[in-house]
Amino acid sequence: MIYYYAPFDDDENFLELLDEKLFLKEKTGVEPVTFMSNQAEKYLSLVKGCDRLYIIAHGDTNGIGHGLNYNNSLTPTQLANKLFKLKLTKEISDIRIFSCDSGIKHSIHIPSFAQRFKEAMLSLGYKKLMVTGYLGQVYFSRDNRITKSFKLDKRRRKGIIPSPEVFRNSLENEIFIASQFKVKF
């Protein structure tokens, strides 16, 4: 089962999650579970070890936040502690931090948000976990999704503008398929 969790409550996230839920149900017949912070206690307790949990938020190499001003934000350790307190199963093996630059090093001596989150989760007893971070500006909204160039594949994919640190591109701001620019820890 796929779970989409937005750890900050706002109308933009709610509408994007609802759009994703309806789209996937129509296309695949499988309805993912989508929820926001105010529903997290209810839904995180349902996640099983084989499930995939997407954390959907605005972000940068330092943290994830609510909107572009990050007045309400979480560090990797704060996010890990929040999931632990909400009783996320320690059997989970796949969490994807779908936020901008979550897989890019913060600095030469400080690992990426995704790697620091994985380390925080390991310290809380999540031993089977693989965490995915993304290497650029990600797009979750279906309005900004792209299609693969293959004629037979009309699915709209999560998009990403790769960070210049990762990929030098002659076409500035060209959007690629997000799964092409991710890193796993």
Residue positions per predicted region:
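Active-site-proximal C-terminal subdomain of hydrolase catalytic domains
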Residues: 95-185
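Catalytic-core segments of thiol-dependent peptidases
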Residues: 2-106
